[in-house]
Amino acid sequence: MSNVHVIDHPLVQHKLTLMRKKDASTNSFRRLLGELSTLMAYEVTRDMPLQDIQIETPLETMTGKVIDGKKLVLVSILRAGNGFLDGMLNVVPGARIGHIGLYRDPDTLQPVEYYFKMPSEMAERDIIVVDPMLATGNSAAAAVARLKQLQPRSIKFVCLLAAPEGVATLQKAHPDVPIYTAAIDRELNDHGYILPGLGDAGDRIFGTK
């Protein structure tokens, strides 16, 4: 699993544990997710390419470094992925935002796209796909396949929790796409929930059932 990165920073692990607690309120869960996504954004963007530019400080001219290439794109897998956006935008406020909506066909159990909205000129952009949970991995794999049609420079997948099954599915379909997660949990149950997990991330973010 050389392309799987578990972010084990103490603050990330501390906040994730607080989110897992069943008595965490919607407000607390949402706040912690924002803080976690900000912390994770630092790790995920660590290898972004840089270019040299000449600038004027108040005292002299110097060569500084800025991010190279087109603006980064954050792509949320609806709806729970939206909970990642504000925290990540704290780190990369100039990023563009895309959304992709998928549901599982009850007969085939395969993901079906119902919404796809991206910024213009996606070719040669770096994309970070966000979804709190990597469970079966089918939706993540479908989303990445759809995004590859736009010929981006790179794609990364970021989640809070991953199941081994989801990691295997996404890696098999897209071995070139790195996975960043705060934890890899034990397994999926019969209903497709990650164990021990944290429940339904979308419901806990938005206060729904």
Swiss-Prot record:
Its cofactor is Mg(2+). It is an enzyme of class 2 (transferase). Uracil binds at I194, G199, D200, A201. Belongs to the UPRTase family. One of its GO terms (biological process) is UMP salvage. Allosterically activated by GTP. It comes from the Bacteria. Pfam families: UPRTase. 5-phospho-alpha-D-ribose 1-diphosphate binds at R79, R104, D131, P132, M133, L134, A135, T136, G137, N138, S139, D200. Catalyzes the conversion of uracil and 5-phospho-alpha-D-ribose 1-diphosphate (PRPP) to UMP and diphosphate. GO terms for molecular function: GTP binding; magnesium ion binding; uracil phosphoribosyltransferase activity. It comes from Acidovorax ebreus (strain TPSY). This is Uracil phosphoribosyltransferase. CDD domains: PRTases_typeI. InterPro entries: PRibTrfase_dom, PRTase-like, Upp_B, UPRTase/APRTase, Ura_phspho_trans. It catalyses: UMP + diphosphate = 5-phospho-alpha-D-ribose 1-diphosphate + uracil. The keyword ATP-binding does not apply.
